[in-house]
Amino acid sequence: YEQVIDAQGLVVAPGLVDVHVHFRDPGLTYKEDIHTGAAAAAKGGFTTVVCMANTKPIVDNEETLRYVLEEGKKTGIHVLSCAAISKGFEGKERTDMEGLLKAGAAGFTDDGIPLMDGPFVKEAMEEAARLDTVLSFHEEDKTFIKQNGINHGKVSDQLGIYGSPALAEDSLVARDCMIALATGAKIDIQHISSGHSVEMVRLAKKMGAHVWAEVTPHHFTLTEDAVLEHGTLAKMNPPLRTEWDRQMLIEGLKDGTIDMIATDHAPHSKEEKEKPLTEAPSGITGLETSLALGITSLVKPGHLSLTELMEKMSLNPATLYKLDCGRMEEG
C-alpha cells in the first residue's frame, strides 16, 4: 500500500518537542490542567511535552508521577513528566531517582525553586550520572534577588524596585557547569536569559562538560522594556533582560551553545495577573506562539535556517531525553 501526499510548496516537519511546560496538574488546575495544556501544545504543533514537577503535591513520589502520566495518556499528544530532584523541593534530601525513573520519569528538576546547596547538587549529579539521566536546573540565586520577575537594571530603577540581577543566574550557571564537568552528569540549564551565562555554557562545552541549554521565545524576542508596556504579563522568572542579553541569546542559538527552544509555558489565572506588579506571580504562556516567534524572530532575519529551528524544537530536545521522536523517518 502506497500513499503519495503532494507536499509541493509545503514544509514537512516532525512534531515539535517542548522539554519545559507547566500544566499545573495536580492541585493548581484553576490555572491550567493536563488536558487544556495538551490542547494548547497541539495547537502550537507540539506532539511531545515534558511537564515540570512543581505541582501540588510535588511530583517527588511515584503516585503523583503516575497520575500525571496516566492523565497524559488521555490527551492527543505525548505528555511526559520530570520528577523532583529533592523531596518537597526543600533541597535537602534526594528523591528516589532510580525508582522514579522505573516509574516513568523523563528526568529530574526542582524547576521554580533553585537548588542552593552545592554539595547536594554534586551528590544529585553523581546519582544522575550513574543512572544516565538528565538533571535540569533553574538558575537564580535568591540571595541576590529582592523582587523576582523583573530584571535589576534601568526598568527596575524607573519603577523604584530592586529586581533580579543577571548575577543571580550567572553565579549558579557557573557553579553547575563546573559540577557537571567534575561529575560527568548530563544537565540542562533551563530558560537561559543572561548573555554572560551563554558565555559560560559555551566555555563549559569546550571543556567537555555535558551541558545543554534551553532558551524561551520570550527571552529571545523581548527585553525588560516590555514590563513598562505590559506590566505583569511581562513578569517571569528569570526576567526579561537587556537588548545585549537578547542578542547574546541569539548568538548562542546560532553557534549551537543553546541547543533547544523550550517555552516554559507557565499559565496563571486572570485574577492573579491583575494583581500589582510586585504581588502578581511570574509566568507567561508560550505553546501556541513558540513556532511562529521562532520563524518571525530567528528564521526571517536569517539567524537560523528553518531546518536549524526545527532541530532546536524537535530533534535536539528529543535527543536530550532519548525520546523516539523529533525526526522524520520512513516506516
Predicted regions and their residues:
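Histidine/acidic residue-rich metal-binding segments in metalloenzymes
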Residues: 94-261
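Acidic (Asp/Glu)-rich catalytic clusters
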Residues: 68-74, 97-102
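Divalent metal-coordination and catalytic microenvironments
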Residues: 9, 20, 41, 45, ...
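A glycine-rich helix N-cap at a beta->alpha junction
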Residues: 70-85
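Metal-associated gating/positioning segment near the N- to mid-region
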Residues: 8-72
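Gly-rich Lys/Arg/Thr-decorated short loops/hinges at beta-loop-alpha junctions or inter-strand turns
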Residues: 18-21, 46-51, 78-80, 152-161
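His/Asp/Glu-enriched, well-ordered alpha-helical/loop segment
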Residues: 158-186, 233, 254, 259-261, ...
